Amino acid sequence: MVLLGLLQAGGSVLGQAMEQVTGVNLLSSLLLACAFTLILVYLFRQAIGHLAPLPAGAKSPPYIFSPIPFLGHAIAFGKSPIEFLENAYEKYGPVFSFTMVGKTFTYLLGSDAAALLFNSKNEDLNAEDVYSRLTTPVFGKGVAYDVPNPVFLEQKKMLKSGLNIAHFRQHVSIIEKETKEYFQSWGESGERNLFEALSELIILTASHCLHGKEIRSQLNEKVAQLYADLDGGFSHAAWLLPGWLPLPSFRRRDRAHREIKNIFYKAIQKRRQSEEKIDDILQTLLDSTYKDGRPLTDDEVAGMLIGLLLAGQHTSSTTSAWMGFFLARDKTLQEKCYLEQKTVCGEDLPPLTYDQLKDLNLLDRCIKETLRLRPPIMTMMRMAKTPQTVAGYTIPPGHQVCVSPTVNQRLKDSWVERLDFNPDRYLQDNPASGEKFAYVPFGAGRHRCIGENFAYVQIKTIWSTMLRLYEFDLIDGYFPTVNYTTMIHTPENPVIRYKRRSK
């Protein structure tokens, strides 16, 4: 969930927002002028509010000048962010700064420079200042980036305790069953939007595994739309614009948040009143307490369940879809993955088990290589609260400090044949293997994703089932380009061809 696909057409977000809110009459024009002025003042305060001077004698990172006031490099970056960053790396080295929309971003490229961000303390490089205004309206108050970091760390520890191997063993059969039922509607052959299908399936499987059977049983088309509206809160407009604007997407997000919370409250209260103890994550949270002995409130449990689902939904759905296209492009590799199913699980392909899943090494490497070339989140960010020194430069407070997994995971200094999809590269020595932060699709350090192991279980189970059901092909050789206009870098026009395997 990152900014930085921001404003491809300069002020387009502002313009579109105002078009949604206002009409064409005189009153509307006046309201537009007032709102636009307020937004400019708001953005200006956001831009300069945290800036502080450097200590005497400190050297600033190289700064990429732009003649365009305020917008800076937003247009060029928005059109081709990876190319922009790789060109800057070649010219300026691993640390450099530039301005977009009145904010200064300092990028740390390469493992050594990235270590500053991943090894930092929250009081020095702060995550809440970057992410809270985006996540709090979606997850709710009192959880995640809306609370002091020590409290958030306690909440993550509670969630992580529920993401254990005992639960994963249960999840495999649940995910396999959901996947088979979902693809019954696909028939024998056809062409479908793979990303849309997998996004729906990821929600179904994650809700069943992570929320429990009570909440999953209520997941109908209406509730699925509520999730989509809530997920729509992760947008460039939500990052850039003040939350009080009456945008339709903001209203849909807030309504969905209230309605989903009400569904969760009923399930939570029913579970609290029940004498039955079900071994799942919902029960884990209900039984958890903070260090001071205080139990979680219903509102905290509901917010954490929303966060657990939506934070992982993007990673799993995007990665699953991209891997499908990589396998469709390389039919030999796809067939090897299918044959691995028979080798590991048996010729008759019985129901999957967690232990078998662990032995699907080729499929595991395919996921790993997909995450290398197409990490869902292009940039991880922190707000500098204190001066930070790296590679001989000092980053002042107020800069947004960034690491790009996408760039780090394809640097030619670290990766051999860096743009090739080659799952077998992990069987050999790579320069990157000796670099701690050359491969970070799930982050690292204090903010490493706690759902990484569940994501692997989910994706491996779904794709094991899909490979048993179908063969996949590109349509007329089309391999999707990356859609950089969205917060998560999804495949563009992700339609794939499929045919049911013969028995």
Swiss-Prot record:
One of its GO terms (biological process) is cholesterol biosynthetic process via 24,25-dihydrolanosterol. GO terms for molecular function: heme binding; iron ion binding; oxidoreductase activity; sterol 14-demethylase activity. Ubiquitinated by MARCHF6, leading to proteasomal degradation. Gene3D superfamilies: Cytochrome P450. Keywords: Cholesterol biosynthesis, Cholesterol metabolism, Endoplasmic reticulum, Heme, Iron, Lipid biosynthesis, Lipid metabolism, Membrane, Metal-binding, Microsome, Monooxygenase, Oxidoreductase, Steroid biosynthesis, Steroid metabolism, Sterol biosynthesis, Sterol metabolism, Transmembrane, Transmembrane helix, Ubl conjugation. It is a single-pass membrane protein. Heme binds at C449. Its cofactor is heme. The keyword Transmembrane helix applies. CDD domains: CYP51-like. Its EC number is 1.14.14.154. Inhibited by azalanstat. Inhibited by azole antifungal agents ketoconazole, itraconazole and fluconazole. It catalyses: a 14alpha-methyl steroid + 3 reduced [NADPH--hemoprotein reductase] + 3 O2 = a Delta(14) steroid + formate + 3 oxidized [NADPH--hemoprotein reductase] + 4 H2O + 4 H(+); lanosterol + 3 reduced [NADPH--hemoprotein reductase] + 3 O2 = 4,4-dimethyl-5alpha-cholesta-8,14,24-trien-3beta-ol + formate + 3 oxidized [NADPH--hemoprotein reductase] + 4 H2O + 4 H(+); 24,25-dihydrolanosterol + 3 reduced [NADPH--hemoprotein reductase] + 3 O2 = 4,4-dimethyl-8,14-cholestadien-3beta-ol + formate + 3 oxidized [NADPH--hemoprotein reductase] + 4 H2O + 4 H(+); a 14alpha-methyl steroid + reduced [NADPH--hemoprotein reductase] + O2 = a 14alpha-hydroxymethyl steroid + oxidized [NADPH--hemoprotein reductase] + H2O + H(+). It is an enzyme of class 1 (oxidoreductase). The chain crosses the membrane at residues 24-44. Strongly expressed in liver and testis. Also detected in kidney, lung and epididymis. Pathway: Steroid biosynthesis; zymosterol biosynthesis; zymosterol from lanosterol: step 1/6. GO terms for cellular component: endoplasmic reticulum membrane. Belongs to the cytochrome P450 family. Sterol 14alpha-demethylase that plays a critical role in the cholesterol biosynthesis pathway, being cholesterol the major sterol component in mammalian membranes as well as a precursor for bile acid and steroid hormone synthesis. This is Lanosterol 14-alpha demethylase. It comes from Sus scrofa (Pig). The gene is CYP51A1.
